[in-house]
């Protein structure tokens, strides 16, 4: 008797055929899985590259804030200093600075909206490189301190800053809070810096 008759004859041939088909199906499935994985990886790489290109053109999540710079020479006025934050340059940056004490006094005195805008300090900065700081100009701070609300407009969107300066033990202390200004969705805190000993209210918070 032949070998196939000893081990089952046609049955073994069928079995071998089934095994070959199964192996072929497994191989095809593996190849498809690998192919899909490669395509998914390539798609993610392309999406990541496109985002990097867009961020480099628009400015990504970069923002800026303003802080007062004080000098050892007391006769020199403090300067408002613009500071860049983020991985990408900021493009087409313009800034509007509102002194809240002046604004509230002018509102009580009946100033018109046009008059109020004339009293605001505005800066057309243009482009701001990464890690760049730029002095915008001197500022006069009253003895009781100053409250500034600062509004930024750039190619990558809008953001705003609350800047508070108070004198403590003959030293100026600063509190800064920067938030995005989305057209929709929730406001997000971008940056916050509060000097040690800055005056706080009874709840332990800054009076923003």
Describe these PLM feature segments.
Residues 88-97, 106:
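Short, hydrophobic/aromatic beta-strand segments
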Residues 76, 89-91, 144-146, 159:
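Short loop/turn segments at connectors of secondary-structure elements within structured domains
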Residues 66-74, 82-86, 111-122, 126-127:
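Terminal, low-complexity, charged helical segments
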Residues 14-85:
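Membrane-proximal alpha-helical anchors
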Residues 33-36, 103-157:
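Intrinsically disordered, low-complexity Pro/Gly/Ser/Thr-rich segments with frequent PxxP/GP/PP motifs
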Residues 158-208:
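Acidic, serine/threonine- and proline-rich intrinsically disordered appendage/tail regions
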Residues 1-13:
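N-terminal positive-inside, membrane-proximal cytosolic segments immediately preceding the first
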């Amino acid at each position: 008797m032949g070998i196939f008759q000893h081990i089952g004859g046609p049955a073994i041939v069928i079995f071998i055929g089934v095994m070959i088909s199964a192996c072929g199906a497994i191989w095809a499935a593996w190849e498809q899985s690998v192919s899909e994985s490669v395509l998914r990886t390539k798609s993610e790489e392309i999406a990541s590259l496109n985002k990097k290109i867009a961020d480099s053109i628009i400015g990504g999540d970069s923002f800026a804030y303003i802080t007062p710079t004080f000098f050892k020479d007391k006769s020199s006025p403090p300067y408002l200093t613009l500071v860049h934050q983020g991985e990408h340059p900021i493009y087409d940056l313009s800034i509007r600075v509102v002194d809240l004490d002046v604004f509230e006094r002018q509102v009580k005195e009946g100033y018109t909206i046009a008059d109020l805008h004339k009293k605001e300090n505005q800066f057309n900065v243009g482009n701001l490189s990464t890690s760049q700081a730029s002095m915008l100009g001197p500022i006069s701070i009253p003895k009781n301190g100053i409250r500034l609300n600062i509004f930024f407009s750039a190619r990558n969107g809008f953001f705003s800053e609350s800047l508070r300066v108070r004198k403590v033990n003959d030293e100026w202390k600063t509190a800064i809070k920067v938030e995005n200004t989305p057209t929709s969705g929730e406001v997000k805190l971008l940056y916050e810096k509060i000097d040690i000993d800055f005056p706080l209210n009874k709840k332990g918070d800054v009076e923003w």
